[in-house]
Amino acid sequence: MKIGFDHEKYIEEQSKYILERVNNYDKLYLEFGGKLLYDLHAKRVLPGFDENAKIKLLHKLKEKVEIIICVYAGDIERNKIRGDFGITYDVDVLRLIDDLRSYDLQVNSVVITRYSGQPSTTVFINKLERRGIKVYKHEATKGYPADVDTIVSDEGYGKNPYIETTKPIVVVTAPGPGSGKLATCLSQLYHEYKQGKVAGYSKFETFPVWNVPLKHPLNIAYEAATVDLKDVNMIDSFHFDAYNEVAVNYNRDIESFPLLKRIIEKITGEESGYKSPTDMGVNRVGYGIIDDEVVKKASEQEIIRRYFKTGCEYKKGYLDKETLHRSKIIMHELNLKEDDRKVVMPAREYSAKLKKRYNKNEVYPVVALELEDGKVLTGRNSDVMDGTAAVILNAVKYLANISDEIHLISPVILEPIINLKLKTLGSKSTALTCEEILIALSICAVTNPTAQVAMEKLSMLRGCQAHSTTILSGNEEQTFRKLGIDITCDPEYPSESLYYNN
């Protein structure tokens, strides 16, 4: 993989800049946008970026940092899913606490925002409190968004309980957008100033990158990733007016800046030092880019990947037609086509061949996988295994120089598993999933040295690209995610069945 980003340089620059910002205050509330851990989007568009860069940055500052996690009560009630992991937001909060603790970072508390006694949220609160985690409940802010006098009063932010903190940097993070991070920061600012303390607010948002051109694929990839939020990158007019310098920000931050500035000035009683939303940010990711061409190409591939994802989400009913249309416009903006993703055409061509051979009306499920050396392999559905499983076996055979004729998994192992699925568990399909095949392979590896050699090649699939001609099940997507393979799908179901496609 070609590297376009210097991780070490970025960490050094970023930590120095945050410490410079905190020097102006007794305490700095730092709103962390995006993902604190496993930032796979950043890793894909900035080759060389560490997906856990942010948490490693905080670990470097751990003596000065404590963390507040926000989660919106409505997201818990409707079981909102974090797309990249396939887990609900409440479960992600638990995962986040565990991950932060593993980096020796102090988790202060969890804040439930816009809480109004929702039943599922109350159960979640009980679960946290009984595990010794402090929980604060914040109601919707009275007067928000327009009535600044009410917002900045004992009826507004003053109604929220004050969260006791001890470190100079308080990071406020969340499982996803719309979790109430900003409101929590401002509520704390209000209480700090009431107590006579000088506190500040800043924002750490990786994308869009303020010092990279507006129409750079890196910034357009951010629009593609947030197409459902209707985020649009714009020139920060406030920044240009103040400094005669071009900076990129996104529409929501630019639109909300005048109100946010007024709220901060009302809380502090003095003019804000921030002249623009870009001023509020502390992001230095642009300074870590060392090869612009590599970043451009990686970002273009991410835009195509996001386009396929949007198509599948639309097919499943999660997104509206306007979002799908916007995704297409982003593709056209950079003259990108579906087949610019190398794995797409091999999968489709093999699928069309099989469809013709078996005289099927439906799309034939095929998965294509590109290895690091550029070799593209395919796998198809059969009675024994899914296409996902077939392509993984084909890949490890290729990497281990094992002949295609050699069976890695003994029929003695396969038959009892198939019988268990069909006869005991009552499964409609005998075909083994990718995960089931990998378990079978690991069993065979105990007595079969060839299978053991193949098993050892699985780690070489991390970072590979794949494409499926049909929508995969959640379990199959999860398995590929665990293997570190980026997979896209055509927005087609493998059959006309409704329930058994889920």
UniProtKB/Swiss-Prot annotation:
> Which Pfam families does the record match to this protein?
DUF1846 (PF08903), DUF1846_C (PF20921)
Specify the superkingdom.
Bacteria
Q: Which InterPro entries match?
A: DUF1846, DUF1846_C, DUF1846_N
Q: Which Gene3D superfamilies match?
A: dip2346 domain like (3.10.630.10), Domain of unknown function (DUF1846), C-terminal subdomain (3.40.140.40)
Family membership = Belongs to the UPF0371 family.
Cross-referenced NCBIfam families, in alphabetical order?
Answer: PRK13663.1 (NF010184)
What is this protein identified as?
UPF0371 protein CTC_00401
Organism of origin: Clostridium tetani (strain Massachusetts / E88)
Q: What is the lineage of its organism?
A: Bacteria, Bacillati, Bacillota, Clostridia, Eubacteriales
